[in-house]
Design a protein with these regions (language model features):
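Short acidic (Asp/Glu) and glycine-rich catalytic loops that position anionic groups and cofactors
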Residues: 30, 201-202, 299-302
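N-proximal short alpha-helices
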Residues: 3-7, 14-16, 24, 183-197, ...
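Exposed alpha-helical structural elements
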Residues: 12, 46-50, 189-193, 244, ...
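N-terminal pre-transmembrane cytosolic regions of membrane proteins
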Residues: 1-130
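Short, well-structured alpha-helical interface segments that form or flank functional binding sites
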Residues: 74, 83, 212, 219, ...
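Membrane-associated alpha-helical segments
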Residues: 252-357
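Extended alpha-helical interaction modules
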Residues: 91-250, 254
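Structural beta-strand/beta-sheet cores of well-ordered domains, especially the beta-sheet scaffolds
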Residues: 30-32, 84-86, 174-176, 308, ...
Length: 357
């Protein structure tokens, strides 16, 4: 069968559907994912060079690679390049079968000394997952609490009851820890649950990057709104001399537009990351576990208000920009009317002098 000439990017677009398959994970097993912020494209090469240290002598990865899978001893390693961050995922197909010591990370000793601490870029999220076999009901909350060192745990059954997830969602030495009690998972399904938990934690942190920006911007917006109100009060009171007001308004508009240019993409990214968090929660198909607050309910109470603050700052900034534009139009209109009045007066004066002559 002979087909027309392919679009140059067709194969790449078709392969995108299969570019990032879920890794399979065994039970018992352990997973650690570390996300570091991507500062510039130059760091891509640094990541690939760092990964090459795990397999000396292996063929070099393509400079344009967006993902890479390799092995270091008994540990499987997966690297992915995203728009704003890198993810490094480490998987062990062996692990404790009991609660005691299930979150120990001795299996990471297979990595070269100091290699993990030297990952390129500042860390934004680290997620540790332990998968334990549990053919019956999950342990009572009281027996799980000592593992986390916290009495406040959240979790639920997931994957239509095939597993139970428990966490405290606290950052302990920079790591968020999850326990997955495997009731009836196969390796592929366990891998999907692990990936969703990793993405839930990572994208939650990425979404929160704009919260400090929103908090700072809210204070600035209050000041800028007061300045606009003061300018409009002077506009109403003034009978002439709109040029100084217009100059001040132009300066205010420039400051607001500068802030929008600096922070607009950050707020937009937050909304995209928030959407991913919501989708990952929905995909886990939660079921209630007695004694545990559901993960979605916990995030709804804690994470959602932060997201709404970011959305409010973005909307307030856009509204202020629109108000400034309307105010500028009013000032320009009045200035044009005044210039027209002066021109008419000048013409009338000239006509009068001509008549006297």
């Amino acid at each position: 069968m002979k087909l027309p000439t392919e679009f140059a990017q067709r194969q790449r677009l078709a392969d995108e559907l299969h570019a990032r398959p879920f890794e399979s994970v065994a039970t018992p097993g352990a997973v650690l994912s570390v996300a570091t912020l991507r500062g510039s494209p130059a760091e891509d090469a640094a990541c690939l060079a760092h990964l090459a240290l795990l397999q000396p002598g292996a063929p070099a990865a393509a400079a344009t690679a967006t993902h890479l899978s390799l092995r270091c001893g008994a540990v499987r390693v997966r690297w992915e390049r995203h728009t704003e961050f890198y993810s490094f995922t480490f998987i062990s197909d062996t692990g404790p079968t009991e609660l005691a010591g299930c979150l120990d990370a001795d299996w990471l000793n297979a990595l070269p000394a100091g290699w993990l601490a030297a990952l390129p870029g500042p860390m934004i999220a680290a997620t540790q997952i332990a998968l334990l076999p549990c053919p019956g009901e999950p342990p009572h909350v009281r027996s799980v609490a000592p593992v986390f060192g916290s009495e406040v745990l959240v979790g639920n059954r997931v994957a239509d009851g095939a597993a139970t997830v428990v966490t405290d969602l606290r950052s302990v030495q920079g790591v968020t820890r999850f326990l997955v009690f495997d009731h009836a998972l196969n390796r592929r399904r366990a891998g999907r649950i692990a990936q969703r938990l990793i993405e839930l934690d990572t994208y939650r942190m990425m979404a929160l990057l704009s919260l400090p920006v929103a908090s700072k911007r809210m204070g600035e917006l209050a000041t800028e709104e007061e300045q606009l109100a003061s300018l409009m009060n002077r506009f109403r009171a003034a009978s002439d001399g709109d040029e100084p007001l217009l100059a001040e308004l132009t300066d205010l508009a420039a400051r607001v537009e500068h802030a929008m240019a600096n922070h607009g993409s950050r707020f937009s990214a937050t909304q995209a990351y928030r959407g991913i968090v919501d989708r990952r929660l929905a995909e886990m198909r939660e079921q209630l576990v007695p004694g545990l607050q559901p993960l979605s309910e916990f995030l709804d109470r804690r994470f959602r208000p932060a997201m709404e603050s970011c959305a409010a700052a973005s909307a307030r900034q856009a509204q202020l920009s629109e108000r400034i534009a309307r105010a500028a139009q009013l000032l320009q209109t009045r200035a044009e009317v005044e210039r027209e009045r002066q021109n008419q007066a000048l013409l009338a004066s000239m006509d009068k002098r001509q008549g006297l002559q």
